[in-house]
Regions:
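Active-site neighborhoods and metal-handling regions in enzymes and metal-associated proteins
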Residues: 1-430
């Protein structure tokens, strides 16, 4: 592993928190992700399923976790099933976890090889009152490709069609949204690596560089800092491309007088960071660019004061929309008449700020969490307002990651990353 693994006490605690939400006599099942093939004998790098990782710390394919707190056999209240390693596998693929290593990573004492799964699982299902199965219930999930979890659910329903099924996803969304101090440490590390990348870019950008040159510089810094790379596909969008919210081609030349909108973040230990900065290609903002930049920064700073415990996310987004509306009027992008005649379902400000301000972040960049419950301590959110003006070939977004406190304003995990335009200009022209 490139990263420092967290102590198993975290995963023991996470399983305890999960178990507290289960019905009496319930059995829960979690599967690892597949290794996804591309063509011929090629495949994408393995990325572990966030839920089994959150509950076990095991970062290995072909793994299954069972949680059965009320089992009559105390050795079967937590079970990990792993692919059995061998000298041949070690030569071709590298060493896999043995049972002792699996315990050291997860705190799970009972570890079996995968070929024993069906026999043991059958005995546990018979004893259980219901079975919690795991599905991807993220509001923006792409569910076209069948996953290992999907195949398991199909198999389970065929074999155990008379058994009661429950959903693990609502529980996972709840417990994953509240971060442990150890998780926050990993997220801070990811943000610190992202800072290194950002400072490298401020010293690198000049007219004539390609967007992909910037992407390459970032990847260099991330890999050198023990990150596995980008937490998500980076956006390096110069000029008018900055008005395409998910522009990922990164293949244009950065021209004198343009602003580059960059949205990127390092991954560390499975945890994401998510940063947006907008910088002038030539190191100097024009007055108009400054005005738009400062409007976005004002909204971001004021939004951070609103992101507090007890508030509902929907209410928070309405309040931020009002902040943005005021700034767009000041910039003469919308008028009071536009506001008076606006469609309530799509306010006038959305012509220039059409996305949300904040999302959960953690093991996933767009992490799971419940919008139906109030903001709570140790949740982590982005704050990322933006203004996009295609007719001016200008798009500016500013984004940092924030940890909710017990009271008062959140803590900015990216507070050391330059954001004031004067500092950005100074660093680009030193």
């Amino acid at each position: 592993m490139k990263y420092t693994k967290l102590d198993k006490s975290l995963y023991i605690n996470n399983r305890k928190r999960f178990s507290e939400h289960l019905e009496s006599g319930a059995l829960a099942v979690f599967n690892s992700n597949d290794i996804f093939g591309t063509s011929a004998d090629s495949s994408l790098p393995f990325v572990q399923h966030r839920d089994i990782f959150h509950l076990s710390g095991v970062d290995q394919e072909e793994s299954i976790l069972l949680v059965f707190p009320d089992s009559s056999n105390k050795n079967h209240r937590e079970i990990l099933f792993l692919k059995e390693t061998s000298p041949l596998i070690a030569v071709w693929e590298g060493a896999k976890l043995d049972k002792k290593q699996a315990y050291e990573a997860s705190g799970i004492k009972t570890v079996y090889w995968l070929d024993q799964f069906e026999t043991i699982f059958n005995a546990l299902v018979v004893e259980s009152s219901c079975v919690y199965l795991n599905t991807n219930e993220h509001t923006r999930a792409n569910t076209e490709a069948q996953t290992r979890e999907d195949r398991f659910i199909y198999w389970f329903k065929e074999k155990y069609h008379a058994h009661n099924i429950r959903r693990s996803a609502p529980i996972m969304h709840k417990i994953r949204s509240i971060k442990h101090s150890l998780e926050l440490g990993q997220m801070q590390k990811a943000c610190d690596i992202t800072e290194k990348g950002m400072r490298r870019i401020l010293d690198f950008v000049k007219p004539g560089v390609m967007e992909y040159n910037i992407e390459a510089e970032l990847m260099h810094e991330f890999l050198n800092s023990c990150s596995r790379g980008f937490a998500y596909t980076p956006i390096i969008a110069s000029g008018k491309s900055a008005c395409v919210l998910h522009y990922i081609e990164n293949n244009n030349i950065c021209k004198d007088g343009e602003v580059i909108l960059m949205d990127f973040g390092a991954e560390y230990g499975g945890y994401a960071s998510d940063l947006s900065r907008s910088i002038p290609v030539n190191g100097k903002f024009t007055q108009r660019q400054k005005d738009v930049y400062n409007s976005v920064l004002h909204v971001k700073n004021e939004a951070s004061k609103l992101l507090v415990p007890g508030k509902m996310l929907n209410d928070y987004h309405v309040e931020v929309g009002e902040l943005m509306q005021e700034q767009l009027v000041n910039l003469k992008l919308i008028s009071l008449e536009d506001i008076k005649n606006q469609d309530a379902s799509w306010p006038a400000y959305k012509k220039y700020f059409m996305h949300g301000t904040s999302h959960f972040i953690g093991l996933d960049t767009h992490d799971v969490g419940l919008w139906t419950e109030p903001i709570d301590e140790n949740m982590v959110f982005t704050i990322e307002p933006g203004i996009y003006i295609p007719e001016e070939n200008l798009g500016i977004r500013l984004e940092d990651d924030y940890v909710i406190q017990k009271s008062g304003e959140p803590i900015n995990l990216m507070k050391n990353i330059p954001i004031e335009l004067e500092e950005i200009e100074e660093l680009m022209n030193k």
